[in-house]
C-alpha cells in the first residue's frame, strides 16, 4: 500500500516487489540497531538474497543512508556525509555513476545512472516500479524504480585514494532534461552538461583521477565542498567555468 501511494506500479509481479520491501526493512533495522549510516554491497556476494537490492537500496538512500555499489565504501561514506550536509537545503543529493555520453557536436551530454540503485531524490516525475531481468549477478529479476531526472545547476563529487592521502574532486555541472524518451533503458537516470565544456570538463575529471562512481547534488555548491575539504584536511580539485586547457597541463607537471 505504501509503495502504491508513492509510486506507479507498472508490474504485476508483486512478489518481486515484496521481496525488495523485506530487504529494505531488514537492512534499515540492522543499520539503525548498529548505528551505521552507510552501506555497500556487491552483486557477487549476496548470500541468501534472491535479488540484488534495487528498490530497497533506492528507498534507503531516500532516507539519507549512504550507499556504494560494488563494494565502493568511499562513495558510500561520501554520499552519507553530503546528504547530511544538504539537509534543509532545496535540491537533490545522491549516488550516481557515469554511464555513457551523447556526443552530438556542440551539445555533448553525459547520461548518468546505475543498473538499479539511483536515489528517488533525483526523480522529476512520479517513479514507476517495474521488474525487469538483470544480466549480471545470477539472481532473480529485481524490482526497481524508474524515472527521468531533475534539472538545474549542480555539482558532481567523488573521492579517490591517492595512496598516501584521499583526494576530493568537485565539478560544476548543469542537469538537463533528456533530449528524447528512453523507453528501452529500464533504469532511473539523470543527464547533465559538463563545465566549462565537454572536452575540458571530462579531461580534467579523468586527469584528476575521477572515478565513475560519484555523488551529484543540486542542493550543495562548490563552496560547500571546499568547506568540507578544509574541515577534514582533504585535498580538493575543482572543475568549472574557470577551468582552462592550461589547467589540464598541471596534472602532468612534477
Over which residues does each language-model region extend?
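Conserved active-site and cofactor/substrate-binding residues in soluble primary-metabolism enzymes
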Residues: 18, 22-25, 34, 72-77, ...
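Accessory "access/gating" subregions that flank catalytic or transport cores
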Residues: 5-11, 16-48
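Extended hydrophobic packing segments that form well-structured cores
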Residues: 139-254
Amino acid at each position: 500500500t505504501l509503495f502504491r501511494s508513492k509510486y506507479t506500479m507498472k508490474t504485476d509481479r508483486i512478489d518481486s516487489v515484496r521481496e525488495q520491501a523485506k530487504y529494505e526493512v531488514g537492512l534499515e533495522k540492522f543499520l539503525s540497531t548498529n548505528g551505521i549510516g552507510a552501506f555497500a554491497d556487491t552483486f557477487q556476494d549476496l548470500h541468501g538474497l534472491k535479488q540484488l537490492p534495487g528498490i530497497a537500496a533506492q528507498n534507503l538512500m531516500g532516507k539519507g543512508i549512504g550507499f556504494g555499489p560494488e563494494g565502493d565504501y568511499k562513495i558510500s561514506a561520501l554520499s552519507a556525509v553530503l546528504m547530511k550536509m544538504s539537509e534543509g537545503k532545496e535540491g537533490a543529493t545522491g549516488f550516481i555513476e557515469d554511464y555513457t555520453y551523447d556526443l552530438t557536436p556542440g551539445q555533448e551530454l553525459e547520461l548518468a545512472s546505475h543498473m538499479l540503485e539511483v536515489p528517488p531524490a533525483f526523480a522529476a516525475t512520479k517513479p514507476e516500479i517495474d521488474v525487469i531481468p538483470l544480466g549480471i549477478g545470477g539472481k532473480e529479476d529485481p524490482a526497481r524504480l524508474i524515472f527521468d531526472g531533475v534539472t538545474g545547476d549542480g555539482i558532481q563529487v567523488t573521492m579517490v585514494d591517492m595512496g598516501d592521502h584521499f583526494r576530493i574532486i568537485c565539478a560544476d555541472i548543469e542537469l538537463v532534461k533528456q533530449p528524447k524518451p528512453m523507453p528501452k533503458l529500464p533504469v532511473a537516470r539523470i543527464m547533465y552538461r559538463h563545465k566549462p565544456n565537454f572536452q575540458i570538463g571530462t579531461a580534467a575529471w579523468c586527469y584528476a583521477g575521477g572515478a565513475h562512481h560519484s555523488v551529484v547534488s543540486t542542493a550543495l555548491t562548490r563552496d560547500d565542498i571546499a568547506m568540507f575539504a578544509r574541515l577534514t584536511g582533504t585535498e580538493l580539485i575543482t572543475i568549472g567555468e574557470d577551468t582552462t586547457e592550461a589547467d589540464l597541463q598541471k596534472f602532468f607537471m612534477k
